[in-house]
Amino acid sequence: RNDQAKREEWKVTLDTENRDRSYLFGRLLAVLEQAEAATYGKEDRRETNALRRLTRYTQQPMHTARALYEKLNPYLNRLMRNKPGLYRQYRALFDQLFGLLDELEHTSLNEPLEDVYLLGYSSQRSALFTKQEQNETNTDGGNTDE
């Protein structure tokens, strides 16, 4: 088994072509986490619902994702009012990821995740931070001109 793990290669950057169930759930976890965190103020250091339920998420990913998504509604409403571009970005990611998960065998959706979910989580989170930094740079540049 170790030989197989050594031969298996995973991209550190976001792999949007990867259809591995655990990888996709890792990506979804990052989006659930960051959509909520995007509504926090700079001084707000509380843990997101997604991180509080991380252990359960890895054991029952689909049930936990549904519960987290339902809890996310007030945060998404806040994003829609205050940061509509970011709201659209997260909505598109949710649609994409739920669509990809829907293509998988439904009986496997709630089985425990393999460790590769961490790669999906980390790469999606990194991609979101990069995009957010680019948007903030563009916004800051625009605000100084006005």
Residue ranges, per PLM feature:
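Intrinsic-disorder/low-complexity detector
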Residues: 1-146
